[in-house]
């Protein structure tokens, strides 16, 4: 146990009972469960449900009444449950009550206040005005107009949770369980701290240290996807609370963990997901405000320590009693401003207030394993210079692997597995992982910070949010398509630092993968373009490795890895051309007299024409059609490319078998060495089987070979789809830098709060409505959405930006097409190149396929060599992992 942390709840106080609306003790209160004095959290309510006698100007604000009467949630007794005292996050000068941290009594004084208040009294406590009963039925409604005191214009409300929920909760005597805190942020996330906003963890009498800060970002995901992620997070928190022998974790580990849910746009959040948050006690309808003191609210922040768990039964989310508390911070952004802005709220606003040790990033729908977050944290604990880590992303295969029946899911499963078996371990062995996936990764907060000049990883990470078209270069304007890759590069190359990145095999996260062609095309457009521009960025800034404080050996290793990534990028650039060359060489070879003869020549011509038509169709559809509107075209092309791949595999096997038979029947004694000297067998079989053999061997050594049996064939058949359809669509849409969502969506208009001399009036729902709000969610507001009128200058700026990106797109596609066409023409001696050089014509007459065969040999063996390099790195990763433990 760390010195100064009190892990027992209220060891020196008397157990308190909640005054529930029914007689008898609360069914949610746990007898003998006490509250820790350091966990005392005074409400921001001068006229609150807490000891109304203390609302007098002559009352001692530091004196607590009897525990049995601390709270009353009877709506007939108190209509001013929402009244809030001024929000003053500035701690008092000096040490409260004369105690210094570490001295006896620092953690054990029940009378020590949370924060001092200079003025807690309002001139007009409340006035209740009954309003006509609504059409909904017999619920007594009150329009409660309250006097609200603001601190420097900040509106903060402590709202009691619905009694129906409160009756189910243990620890009901503590404020963090009985009240939900709402803050109306009216500033940019970068100014959240300077505007004197704070969070609950800093307001306890002894502020809580945040060891793990977990963010779940969402847009319009349904309640199933959201619950899937939250169930995984809750299981991890429970796992850490059960580690009773740990120096960091233990019974009260939940106090060191904060779960932040950031929803991108109030008008975009799924109503069922919002209702689920309300069921957990985190969200309440009717609290949010549109403006505060003339300032537009940018984010609605709800804080609550929930004890409500959930499970998914037959496709329905069910709330269940949860004994393990979880501190939840729900940030509902007013506008849809993309995921990178959600991360800016997480890092720049909330992270600066809480100053966490480790930050974990999750996408809604990604379910971490039961102890995966702990294993991520452990990697940082074991390696002080670890700046970032990621786990294994798994494709969600369904019960019994039923989703593998879909070839697209099986192909992505194979792709994910091989990346986690070869690519990630190799990069981890060098210390630089090119991308830590935002769906499931973790960072050390201190490593992310910028320097005194404001330059650093976070500055680069958020740069793309404010860049505009022609005002920026090609690298900067496309940076945020690969912001996670840029962040990884900036961390490892951070000036005067020697941070490294690690892959943690023990940490896993399951995620849904696209199950239709159109969804896959749209997803990979951003992925491929992001990785392409990130690779260009890394190549253009490779020298920044040398500004870091890494050792000479580490810099050499990073330089080798940089060369490896450069070679991979070259192969990715020429992937379309290389695939066509292999296709052309093999189909022409089948026309030989010793193979299929005239039949092979006819098949070669037919398939070549079909190949050209399909590739041309890909370009036409990619330049203007939406994939969702061309679904049948894309599906047809997937089947066609699969047929092409079957034909290629047949050609390779048939040619190799014929070559072996020729060696056997040539009249000389057959030997294995002679077989390997056969150029056809050596080029086709040995090189290709070396690549596939390395895949099998590495999978078995990682004790994860099943994808080789369930997904390998599907991956082989859909390889041409990845090369032609996905690459073509991605390059033809490099001008589209969107995430698939539009910004500046207008939500329903909310009430506003205006102030004068630091106080003002606002309408708040009466406590008698809480149960009704808890049972149902409002679906509409009376006022219409606010229409944004764009000035001509803004429209011209947006059009200029799109023109710039279209120009970048045109240049990129032209360069890509010309270079790939040129490669094919040179290798195949086509497009009239054979008539330019007379010497070349003579060589072509002797062996027309010599150049093509040499090139195919180089390509196939290069692929095998890259696979072998990955295998060596993966084996080194396994050796290090044996000693490291995670």
Swiss-Prot record:
Alphabetized PANTHER family for the sequence: CHITIN SYNTHASE, CHITIN SYNTHASE 1
Pfam family, one: Chitin_synth_1
Basic and acidic residues composition-biased segments: 7-17, 106-122
Role description: Polymerizes chitin, a structural polymer of the cell wall and septum, by transferring the sugar moiety of UDP-GlcNAc to the non-reducing end of the growing chitin polymer. Involved in tolerance to hyperosmotic conditions. CHS3 is the only V.dahliae chitin synthase that is not involved in virulence.
Region of interest: Disordered: 1-70, 86-138, 745-768
Entry-linked InterPro entries: Chitin_synth, Chitin_synth_fun, Chitin_synth_N
Catalysed conversion reaction: [(1->4)-N-acetyl-beta-D-glucosaminyl](n) + UDP-N-acetyl-alpha-D-glucosamine = [(1->4)-N-acetyl-beta-D-glucosaminyl](n+1) + UDP + H(+)
Organism: Verticillium dahliae (strain VdLs.17 / ATCC MYA-4575 / FGSC 10137) (Verticillium wilt)
Compartments where located: Cell membrane
Mode of membrane association: Multi-pass membrane protein
Predominant location category: membrane
Residues spanning the membrane: 428-448, 526-546, 556-576, 602-622, 637-657, 683-703, 712-732, 813-833, 858-878
Keywords for this protein: Cell membrane, Cell wall biogenesis/degradation, Glycoprotein, Glycosyltransferase, Membrane, Transferase, Transmembrane, Transmembrane helix
Top-level lineage group: Eukaryota
Annotated GO CC locations: cell septum; chitosome; plasma membrane
Protein name according to UniProt: Chitin synthase 3
């Amino acid at each position: 146990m760390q010195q100064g942390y009190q892990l027992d709840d209220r060891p020196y106080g008397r157990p308190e009972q909640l005054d529930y609306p029914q007689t008898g003790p609360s069914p949610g209160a746990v007898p003998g469960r006490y509250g820790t004095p350091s966990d005392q959290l005074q409400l921001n309510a001068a006229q609150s449900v807490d000891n109304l006698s203390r609302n007098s100007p002559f009352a001692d604000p530091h004196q607590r009444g009897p525990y049995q009467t601390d709270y009353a949630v009877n709506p007939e007794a108190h209509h001013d449950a929402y009244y809030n005292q001024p929000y003053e996050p500035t701690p008092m000068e000096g040490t409260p009550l004369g105690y210094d941290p570490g001295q006896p009594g620092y953690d054990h004084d029940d009378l020590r206040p949370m924060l001092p208040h200079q003025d807690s009294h309002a001139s007009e406590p409340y006035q209740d005005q009954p309003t006509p009963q609504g059409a909904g039925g017999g619920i007594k409604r009150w329009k409660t107009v309250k006097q609200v005191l603001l601190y420097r214009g900040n509106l903060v409300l402590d709202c009691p949770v619905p009694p129906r929920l409160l009756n189910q909760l243990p620890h009901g005597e503590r404020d963090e369980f009985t009240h939900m805190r709402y803050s109306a942020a009216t500033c940019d996330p970068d100014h959240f701290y300077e505007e004197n906003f704070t969070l609950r963890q800093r307001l306890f009498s002894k502020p809580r240290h945040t060891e793990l800060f977990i963010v779940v970002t969402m847009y319009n995901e349904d309640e199933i996807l959201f619950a899937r992620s939250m169930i995984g997070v809750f299981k991890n928190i429970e796992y850490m609370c059960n580690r009773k022998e740990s120096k960091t974790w233990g019974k009260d580990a939940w106090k060191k963990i904060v779960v932040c849910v950031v929803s991108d746009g109030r008008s975009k959040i799924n109503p069922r997901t919002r209702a689920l948050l309300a069921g957990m006690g985190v969200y309440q309808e009717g609290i949010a405000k549109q403006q505060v003191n003339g300032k537009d609210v940018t984010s609605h922040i709800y804080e609550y320590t929930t004890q409500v768990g959930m499970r998914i039964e037959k496709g329905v989310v069910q709330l269940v009693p949860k004994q393990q508390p979880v501190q939840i911070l729900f940030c509902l952004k007013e506008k849809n401003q993309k995921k990178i802005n959600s991360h800016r709220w997480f890092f720049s606003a909330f992270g600066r207030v809480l100053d966490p040790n480790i930050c974990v990033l999750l996408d809604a729908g990604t379910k971490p394993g039961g102890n995966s977050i702990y294993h991520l944290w452990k990697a940082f604990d074991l390696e002080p210079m670890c700046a970032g880590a990621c786990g294994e992303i798994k494709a969600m295969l369904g019960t019994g692997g039923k989703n593998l029946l879909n070839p697209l899911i099986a192909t992505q499963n194979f792709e994910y597995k091989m990346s986690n078996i070869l690519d990630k371990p190799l990069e981890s062995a060098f210390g630089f992982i090119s991308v830590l996936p935002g769906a499931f990764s973790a960072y050390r907060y201190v490593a992310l910070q910028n320097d005194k000049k404001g330059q650093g990883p976070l500055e680069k990470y958020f740069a793309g949010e404010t860049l505009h078209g022609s005002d920026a270069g090609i690298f900067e304007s496309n940076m945020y398509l690969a912001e996670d890759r840029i962040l990884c590069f900036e961390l490892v190359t951070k000036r005067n630092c020697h941070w490294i990145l690690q892959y943690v095999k023990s940490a896993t996260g399951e995620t849904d993968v696209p199950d239709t062609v159109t969804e896959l095309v749209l997803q990979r457009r951003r992925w491929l373009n992001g990785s392409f521009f990130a690779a260009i960025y890394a190549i253009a800034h490779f020298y920044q490795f040398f500004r870091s404080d890494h050792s000479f050996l580490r810099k050499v290793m990073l330089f080798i890895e940089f060369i490896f990534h450069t070679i991979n990028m070259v192969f990715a650039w020429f992937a379309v051309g290389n695939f066509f060359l292999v296709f052309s060489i093999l189909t022409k070879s089948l026309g030989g007299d010793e193979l299929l003869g005239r039949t092979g020549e006819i098949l070669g011509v037919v398939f070549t024409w079909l190949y050209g038509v399909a590739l041309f169709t890909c370009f036409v559809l990619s330049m203007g059609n939406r994939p969702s509107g061309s679904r049948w075209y894309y599906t047809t092309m997937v089947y066609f490319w699969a047929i092409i791949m079957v034909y290629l595999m047949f050609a390779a096997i048939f040619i190799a078998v014929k070559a072996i038979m020729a060696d056997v029947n040539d009249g000389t004694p057959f030997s294995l060495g002679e077989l390997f000297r056969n150029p056809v067998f050596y080029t086709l079989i040995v090189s290709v089987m070396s690549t596939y053999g390395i895949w099998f061997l590495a999978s078995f050594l990682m004790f994860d070979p099943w994808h080789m049996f369930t997904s390998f064939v599907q991956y082989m058949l859909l390889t041409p789809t990845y090369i032609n359809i996905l690459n073509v669509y991605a390059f033809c849409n490099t001008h589209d830098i969107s995430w698939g969502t539009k910004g500046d969506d207008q939500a329903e208009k909310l009430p506003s709060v205006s102030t004068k001399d630091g106080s003002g009036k606002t309408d708040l729902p009466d406590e008698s409505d809480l149960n009704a709000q808890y049972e149902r969610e409002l679906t509409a507001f009376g006022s219409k959405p606010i229409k944004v009128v764009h000035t001509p200058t803004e429209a011209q700026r947006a059009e200029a930006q799109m023109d710039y990106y279209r120009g970048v797109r045109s240049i990129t596609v032209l360069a890509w097409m010309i270079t790939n066409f040129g490669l094919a023409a040179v290798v195949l001696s086509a497009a009239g190149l054979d008539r330019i050089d007379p010497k070349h014509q003579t060589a072509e007459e002797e062996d027309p396929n010599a150049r093509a065969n040499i090139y195919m040999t180089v390509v196939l063996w290069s692929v095998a060599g890259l696979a072998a390099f990955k295998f060596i790195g993966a084996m080194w990763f396994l050796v290090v992992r044996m000693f490291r433990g995670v």
